[in-house]
Amino acid sequence: MKVTAAFAGLLATTLAAPATELVTRSINYVQNYNGNLGAFSYNEGAGTFSMYWQQGVSNDFVVGLGRSTGSSNPITYSASYSASGGSYLAVYGWVNSPQAEYHVVEAYGNYNPCSSGSATNLGTVSSDGGTYQVCTDTRVNQPSITGTSTFTQFFSVRQGSRTSGTVTIANHFNFWAKHGFGNSNFNYQVVAVEAWSGTGTASVTVSA
């Protein structure tokens, strides 16, 4: 193929696209479930969001930025996160069929979901320089992406929290797949903050 000067210039421009444009291309979904409870604010183009919540938060909220269709590609983030009650900083998403909700919990307040009496512990998985406790739980007739339904939750909870890094989510998907996770037909996938009690603040940048 003959490469014209105009095409070469376009190619060079594409290859040298600034980081903010790359963020815009990879981030195309805003998760905002009850975000008003956490004073949620965001800049989708810059890949940033923040929130704070106070004692007496009246309901669960889940907010974040990411992909409208999830994948097994790594996700990189950096955050300032502090929480005193029930809260997660996590890669969060859904699979359509079989319907499942998932969390790769990087940090949490005072509640580890794998410590729940209803959780089924599946062992550990090593990823990204750390060890994650893995468990599942079943939600019966609870809110979901299709309304009210019964579905499985998959959790990987990092032992020794972190608030920045790359999540090689394929490692978690592959482990979960041994226990019924669909590992395909993804719905949205975000870096999220969820909270339902206590107080906290978070400021997050998602870069991939």
Swiss-Prot record:
Regulation acting on activity, per entry: N-bromosuccinimide completely inhibits the catalytic activity.
Identify the domain of life.
Eukaryota
The broad enzyme category this protein falls into is hydrolase
For the GH11 domain, which residue ranges apply? 17-207
Q: Which Pfam families match?
A: Glyco_hydro_11 (PF00457)
Q: What is its main location?
A: secreted
Output the InterPro entries linked to this UniProt entry.
Answer: ConA-like_dom_sf, GH11/12, GH11_AS_2, GH11_dom, Glyco_hydro_11
Q: Which SUPFAM superfamilies match?
A: Concanavalin A-like lectins/glucanases (SSF49899)
Task: Name the catalytic site residues.
Answer: E101 (nucleophile), E194 (proton donor)
Where do the TM regions start and end? none
An example Gene Ontology molecular-function term: endo-1,4-beta-xylanase activity
Sorted alphabetically, the Gene Ontology cellular component annotations on this record are: extracellular region
Pathway in which the depicted protein is active: Glycan degradation; xylan degradation
- List localization entries: Secreted
Notes on temperature effects: Optimum temperature is 50 degrees Celsius.
Description of pH dependence: Optimum pH is 3.5.
What role does it play? Endo-1,4-beta-xylanase involved in the hydrolysis of xylan, a major structural heterogeneous polysaccharide found in plant biomass representing the second most abundant polysaccharide in the biosphere, after cellulose.
Family classification: Belongs to the glycosyl hydrolase 11 (cellulase G) family.
Instruction: Output this protein's name.
Output: Endo-1,4-beta-xylanase B
What is the gene called?
A: xynB
